[in-house]
Amino acid sequence: IKAERELQADILKKYASHLPKINEPSPFCFMYSNYLLRMATTAEVEVAVASLAPCFWVYQQVGQKAGAKKIANNPYQAWIDLYSGTEFNHSVDSLIATLNELAENTTLNTQKNMQSAFRRATQCEWKFWQGAYQQESWQI
């Protein structure tokens, strides 16, 4: 997380310092963040972990796909390097292993709740990326 925050600060400094400061998150960033916060504070640990997994997994997949295509002077290369790197891949693999272990050692009902949380977080992740791509903002 520390490396990610440093990377984001560096990217903003290099490429967005001339843009007006955005004081609030986009609609789906706001909703997704609140969903994850709610899961982390109210759900069983197994369900909370399941809700976090799609974010890491998607970033890993996007990083690996982007890392496979080398583009000279890519302004996103540091981002690609972070999310396609060995350290991040190990973190994701560890998270997935933990998620699988939690699922194997819990009740059927909790497994169903884990699946629902994973599916909802995956939907949120997709809408987060779509919203960024379409530059969605609050309509009112």
Task: Give a label for each model feature.
Residues 41, 68, 103-107, 133, ...:
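Short, flexible helix-adjacent loops and helix caps
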Residues 88-119:
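Long amphipathic all-alpha helical oligomerization modules
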Residues 1-90, 119, 123:
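Active-site-proximal alpha-helical scaffolds that flank and shape metal-associated catalytic sites
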Residues 113-140:
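Acidic, carboxylate-rich catalytic segments that either coordinate divalent cations
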Residues 8, 36, 95, 128-129:
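Generic structural hydrophobic/aromatic packing signal, biased to beta-strands
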